[in-house]
Structures are given as structure tokens and as C-alpha cells.
Amino acid sequence: MTAIPTPYEDLLRTIRDEGAHKDDRTGTGTTSLFGQQIRYNLQEGFPLLTTKKVHFHSVVGELLWFLRGDSNVRWLQDNNIRIWNEWADEDGELGPVYGVQWRSWPTPDGRHIDQISRALEMLKNNPDSRRNIVSAWNVSELENMALPPCHLLFQLYVADGKLSCQLYQRSADMFLGVPFNIASYALLTHMFAQQADLEVGEFIWTGGDCHIYDNHTEQVDEQLSRAARPYPTLELNKAASLFDYTFEDIAVSNYDPHPLIRGKVAV
């Protein structure tokens, strides 16, 4: 039987065993390594972790919310997703966070750039471009964001008819956040590929400060004691456009994870 690749779990173990102890903004404390990378071949399954259950409905909903260009948590709440509640103000606003920058990056002359539409257009018309980058790190608006972007930039790359995506994440909560981010950007890669009539290639995750919070150490030990199971298969109905996907278009089959492991979010 072919061994199941476990690049996330391998990195999690390395950070646990070899990381440096650091203080952090939240006051929780972390064990951390800098400048790490994980690679997944998207042809070999959808990288939704099996060593613990990942709430795929929330992964899908957050990505659809980003693609809407939304900055308010109400749409998420209406779809039973509460992962952004801790950072929202009393009106549900988060400021010009991910979706706003993706879909409506402001220019000095008052225009707005739809980076997602531009990225898809480039895949179709100039797939060999080395400039196909989407950034959420708008320095001029960071102070107005409830939380500066952690996963802040991704680049798209086409070779042999296959689309690969590399994400850079400056701050990586390895236990809670990163499993979610891996699934989200893998899904986005599939969506871009489908809309551009490409196959999927690799998803490459690159992390800056890759950390395990001190209050997640027992959960990490539990997760690393579990044997990985086969990855599920993504079922993706082709929508009329990249912005027309709904929950009903996106599902995973044969997802058989170990049970959920809960952990407290550091705010």
C-alpha cells in the first residue's frame, strides 16, 4: 500500500520538537520555526486533513465570502460560520480585509482593481506570466483592518496544462489556522483551474513565523499520535463564473477523518 503523504503533520512535529519558545502579541506564548514549506500534489487527493476533522463548510463559506469582496461577518453568520466573530465590531465590520483587497484594491486615482478577475484573465490569456500574483497586504490600509492578513499573498503558475499555487503566510497558527488555510487555497486553485480549463498541479504553502501556541500543545500531541487516512476527493460543479460558485457546487467525498480536536483561538 502506498504511504499517505503527511507534509503538514511532519512540519507540525518538527516545530514541536525543534522550535524556539517565543512570546507573542496575544500573550499566549508559542513554539516557533521560521521559513517553512509544505507541498501537496493536488492530483493525489484534496488536502483536507484526516488526523483531525476540519470543518469543510466553514472553509467553503469563508472562501466564497472572500470572493464576494465582503468585509462584514453577517453573510458568514447567516451561513452558520462564526470564525471571524472575535474580530468584528458591533456592526459586524472588519474593515478592508482579504476580500476587499482581492476584489477592490483602491488606487490613488480613485479606481479599484479586481485582482481575482485579473488573475483569471491572465491564466486564460498569458498563462506563462511570472506576474500572476494576488496580494492582500495593502500597507496603506493595514491600520484600518481588524486583523492584518496572515495569508497575505499567492502566486499562480502554469506548466504542462496544470495550475499550481503558492501561498505565503506571514503568521501561521499551525494547529488551528493552517489546516483551514491549506484546504481553502487548494479549493481556490481547483476553482481557478476549472474556470481556466486547466488541470490542477501543486499547492505549495510557505510560512513565515510557523508556531504552535502554548495552549495547543496537548492537542498537537494528540493529533500527532494518530495515523493519517486517505485524503478525500473534491467534487466541484463548474459554475458560470469564478464568482458564481455556491455551497451546493462544492463537496468532498470519502472524507473519513479522526475526530475533531478543539483548541482556543488566540485573539
UniProtKB/Swiss-Prot annotation:
Binding positions for dUMP per the UniProt entry: R25, R130, R131, R170, S171, A172, D173, N181, H211, I212, Y213
Q: What's the gene?
A: thyA
The record lists (6R)-5,10-methylene-5,6,7,8-tetrahydrofolate as bound by H55, D173, A266
EC number, as in UniProt: 2.1.1.45
Q: Which InterPro entries match?
A: Thymidate_synth/dCMP_Mease, Thymidate_synth/dCMP_Mease_dom, Thymidate_synth/dCMP_Mease_sf, Thymidylate_synthase, Thymidylate_synthase_AS
Q: What is this protein called?
A: Thymidylate synthase
Q: Which residues form the active site?
A: C150 (nucleophile)
Q: In which pathway does it act?
A: Pyrimidine metabolism; dTTP biosynthesis
- BP GO terms, sorted: dTMP biosynthetic process; dTTP biosynthetic process; methylation
Q: Which Gene3D superfamilies match?
A: Thymidylate synthase/dCMP hydroxymethylase domain
